[in-house]
Structures are given as structure tokens and as C-alpha cells.
Swiss-Prot record:
Top enzyme category: ligase
Originating species: Thermosipho melanesiensis (strain DSM 12029 / CIP 104789 / BI429)
EC number(s) from the headed UniProt entry: 6.3.5.2
This protein's encoding gene: guaA
A GO cellular-component term linked to this record: cytosol
Active site: C80, H166, E168
Substrates-to-products reaction catalysed: XMP + L-glutamine + ATP + H2O = GMP + L-glutamate + AMP + diphosphate + 2 H(+)
Protein's UniProt name: GMP synthase [glutamine-hydrolyzing]
Function comment: Catalyzes the synthesis of GMP from XMP.
């Protein structure tokens, strides 16, 4: 398959470039900027995009444009740092700008295939402190802004382009169109990426790999593992062995709902009741990182033991399926960089492959979350499963601040249920990206009737986001929040105060722990 190869120079927006190109119907993949020539050639590249990044071309050990990229004889587009790296490579001059350009700017463009179908002036998003001061020989200006006289450039052959702004972010008007013009008009690539084609090809591929053997899958009920389950079920039917571990840290009635949902879809799941084991392991633990590690290790132990029992029962389980997504693959590579700062330990089953005697199948490893949801629709999963809000791997343990107790779990489950139920009743659930309740480690004084109370506090959190990388707090109606708070205080024993979290990400993370 022909591929647009995006080389990653460290920008926080790099994944968005791949997503925007795919959204337009062209297959794209992301590789580190210093990927070997063979890695790039293996993807059958039809165009190269150099991402932005935080470096300066004059820094020691600054990332550069690999020589082989220029010898592939395919179109190249440099974005922000990618533009500066190209200019530097060809002998132009890049310098520190006296005025850092960050945020909106008006771009004025010349007539060019890159801007075909666009107005003469439009808004773009800038984020740079260096800027191009002199073009290399054979390059021309095709776009400028007030502070960037060389905001868009190309060479005379119309094969090498550079833009100082970020077409991949939604703040840039017509950004997706610019990327599409580069791929379709300059690289002359034909559309080759549709989800329904992916589904039929993936089912065929799984059949070919697995044959008559069985595949075990750790099922959470979330969209990723549910889509993996449906793909596998379409491919191998009852040779799928889905295992659902009930940690006791799930939402109210969630275990029963997952079982019923999959039974309706004709998929039998194996439920493991491990509630006591997880609660015992978490006894008196308050540190969020420690909670995550304990839950991760306990999950691995439970899943390992269950897998061995099922292997003994069925005999021919040869594969372990995982719901790994493309961002997971990218982040695992990024985490190897010295500059990558760990914010939280991610809960996953990464320790499983080494312990289990199975080969790994990751049907979604090159997909983004929005693409997974599209596959869910093609496979006719219920909308309630496809549009389910994200839920952390460690479950309610990281929504209970402090010690995890049976009482705290019970209170939080009921409060969270009321919040979600009211969001759905008021047609607000699908308008927020994620919503949940948090159990706080404090008590507050209250009055109920003629009596003083001293009870627990619940925080409500709802955010709007595109991909979870950044998020704004949701401006839910005051009347709605008032109703939810009243219901929680009246219906959940042990709560006398409800607060609403109005912090965006950054500076906060979406989850409290």
C-alpha cells in the first residue's frame, strides 16, 4: 500500500498530521525522524512530511533531514521545524526571531497547487521562536504573515514545500485542505484508506493467521476491546475466548451489562470474579502511582492464572489479542526519548506477553480512537458501546482519592450512576467527551432537617475534548448540576456535599489521579 510517511521531530501535534491525512482517505504512518532508510522504503512512500518540533537547527545534536529523504525523489512538506530543517539543509538561513510568533496569524498566499481552492488570506496557527531569514537558492515564497516573511515556500520544481504554521491543528483555517492538496495534487496520490476496506481485509488476515486455533482476549467492555472482540468473532467465531476480569472497581452494574451486551451479540464471555483479591491488594494504599502498579500487577496475575486454566481446558489457545492502538505504539517509542516526562503510569497488560505462551495479535495497532469507533459502526456494535465515555484501566481506584474501601466504592458507584443517568436523560451524554464522579478524602459539615451532619464530598467532572490530549471543562447548565447534586445528596447515603470541577487540561489532567 502506498503511504504518506510522517517523520516525527517532536511536536505535540505530530499525531494529528497522520490523522488529518487519513481522514482525507490517504494512508499515513508515523516514524521517528532518524528512522533507517529501509524502514521508510518498506512503507512504499509516495510523500514525506517533516513534522514540527521544539528544537533549533543550530543546537548541538539538533534533528536534521536525513540525506536519503532527498534522494527518494518524492514530494516533501516541512511543517514549522520541518521547514526550518529543510532551509538549513539547503543552505538558507534560520535565526532567532526578535518576536516569537505564537497563536493566530493572517497568512497571505500566492497562487500555488498547495493552496488551490483557498482564499487569498486566511487564519493560521503559528508556534515558533526561530524563523527563516534567507531562502536557499532555487526556493520561492508562496505565503507570508506579518512576522514571517517566508511563512510558506517551495522549490522551483514544486516537489519540496515548507510551511511555518501548523496545518494539522483545527485553529488553522483550511489546514486539512492544505494537507489534502499536498498529497493529492503535488504527490499525485490516489485515495487508498477506507474503514470498510480495512475491516474486510483485517477479518481475512485474522482468518489466515489463526486458522482453527483459539484466541484469548482480555475484555473490558470499552470500545477498543469490544471492537477487537467483534472483529475476531467475525473472523473465527466461537474460537474466540474473551475473558472479563471483574475487579470490583467498575461502575455500578457494569459487569452484568458487559456480559448481557456480548451475549446479545452472540459472544460468550468468561467472567472472573476477582473483587476481593483487588480490594485486599489495595488495603491502606493511598498513593495513586502505587495503586496503579498494584492493580496492573494483580490484573496480570489474575489473567495469567485464568489463561492457564483455559489453556488446560481448551488445549489449542495459541494467540493473545490486545486492543493496542496507534497512539500506544507511538507513545511507547516516544517514552524511550530522554526528554519524555512520565506524568502517570499507564495501566495496560504490557507484562502479559512475556509470561504467556501465546503469540500476540493486535488488530487495531495502526488505528486512532476515532477510526476504531468507525469500525464499531461498520461491525454494527450498539451505539451505547461505541460512544461510551473513556474509563481508566485502574477503574474507580483512581477516582477514589486516598484509601480504596468497600464503602467508598459503593458511594462512588451510586453517585457516578446518577450523574451519568441524568446526562443521558437530558441529552447531554453525547455532548461531553467524558464525565464522572470523584470520591474526595475529606468530610464536610452539613445540615439535614434539624441535625448536623459530617459526611463525604463528591466532585463531578465533565470535559470536552477531541482526543484527550487537551480538554476544556464542560459548561453544563446550572439547573442540571443543581438537580444532579440534589439527587446524589438525597439518594446516596453518606454524602452531604457535591462540587463541580472547572479546571481544564492543562494545567490539570482529566482524571484526578
Amino acid at each position: 500500500m502506498k503511504t504518506v510517511v510522517v517523520l516525527d521531530y517532536g511536536s505535540q501535534y505530530t499525531q494529528l498530521i497522520v490523522r488529518r491525512v487519513r481522514e482525507k482517505g490517504y494512508y499515513a504512518e508515523l516514524l521517528p525522524w532518524d528512522a533507517k532508510e529501509e524502514e521508510v522504503k518498506r512503507l512504499n512512500p509516495t510523500a514525506i512530511i517533516l513534522s514540527g518540533g521544539p528544537s533549533s537547527v543550530y543546537e548541538k545534536d539538533a534533528p536534521f533531514v536525513p540525506e536519503y529523504v532527498l534522494h527518494l525523489n518524492i514530494p516533501i512538506l516541512g511543517i514549522c521545524y520541518g521547514l526550518q530543517a529543510l532551509v538549513h539543509k539547503f543552505g538558507g538561513r534560520v535565526e532567532k526571531s526578535q518576536k516569537r510568533e505564537f497563536g493566530h496569524a493572517i497568512l497571505e498566499v500566492e497562487e500555488d497547487p498547495l493552496f488551490e481552492g483557498l482564499p487569498k488570506k486566511f487564519d493560521v496557527w503559528m508556534s515558533h521562536s526561530d524563523r527563516v531569514e534567507k531562502l536557499p537558492e532555487g526556493f520561492y515564497v508562496i505565503g507570508r504573515s506579518e512576522n514571517s516573511p517566508f511563512a510558506a515556500i517551495r522549490n522551483k520544481n514544486e516537489t519540496i514545500y515548507g510551511v511555518q504554521f501548523h496545518p494539522e491543528v483545527t485553529h488553522t483555517q483550511f489546514g486539512s485542505k492544505i494537507l489534502e492538496n499536498f498529497v493529492s495534487k503535488i504527490a499525485k496520490m490516489e485515495k487508498n484508506w477506507e474503514m470498510k476496506d480495512f475491516v474486510s481485509e483485517k477479518i481475512k488476515e485474522i482468518k489466515g493467521i489463526v486458522g482453527n486455533d483459539k484466541v484469548i482476549l482480555g475484555l473490558s467492555g470499552g470500545v477498543d476491546s469490544s471492537v477487537v472482540a467483534m472483529l475476531l468473532h467475525k473472523a473465527i467465531g466461537d474460537n474466540l475466548v474473551p475473558v472479563f476480569v471483574d475487579t470490583g472497581l467498575l461502575r455500578l452494574n457494569e459487569g452484568e451489562e458487559v456480559k448481557e451486551n456480548f451475549e446479545r451479540l452472540g459472544i460468550k464471555i468468561f467472567v472472573v470474579d476477582a473483587k476481593k483479591r483487588f480490594l485486599d491488594a489495595l488495603k491502606d494504599v493511598e498513593d495513586p502511582e502505587e495503586k496503579r502498579k498494584i492493580i496492573g500487577h494483580t490484573f496480570i496475575d489474575v489473567f495469567y492464572e485464568t489463561s492457564m486454566q483455559l489453556l488446560e481446558e481448551f488445549g489449542n489457545i495459541k494467540y493473545l489479542a490486545q486492543g493496542t492502538l496507534y497512539p500506544d505504539i507511538i507513545e511507547s517509542k516516544v517514552s524511550e526519548r530522554k526528554s519524555a516526562a512520565k506524568i502517570k503510569t499507564h495501566h495496560n497488560v504490557g507484562g502479559l506477553p512475556e509470561k504467556l505462551p501465546f503469540k500476540i495479535i493486535e488488530p487495531l495497532r495502526y488505528l486512532f480512537k476515532d477510526e476504531v469507533r468507525k469500525i464499531g459502526e461498520i461491525l454494527e456494535l450498539p451505539q451505547s458501546m461505541i460512544n461510551r465515555h473513556p474509563f481508566p484501566g485502574p477503574g474507580l481506584a483512581v477516582r477514589i482519592i486516598g484509601k480504596v474501601t468497600e464503602e467508598a466504592i459503593s458511594i462512588l458507584q451510586k453517585a457516578d450512576y446518577i450523574f451519568i443517568e441524568e446526562l443521558k436523560k437530558n441529552n447531554l451524554y453525547d455532548k461531553v467527551w467524558q464525565a464522572f464522579a470523584v470520591f474526595l478524602p475529606i468530610k464536610s459539615v452539613g445540615v439535614m432537617g434539624d441535625y448536623r451532619t459530617y459526611e463525604n464530598v463528591i466532585a463531578l467532572r465533565a470535559v470536552n475534548s477531541f482526543d484527550g490530549m487537551t480538554a476544556d471543562w464542560s459548561k453544563l447548565p446550572h439547573e442540571f448540576l443543581n438537580k444532579v447534586a440534589k439527587r446524589i445528596i438525597n439518594e446516596v447515603k453518606g454524602v452531604n456535599r457535591v462540587v463541580y470541577d472547572i479546571t481544564s487540561k492543562p494545567p490539570a489532567t482529566i482524571e484526578w489521579e
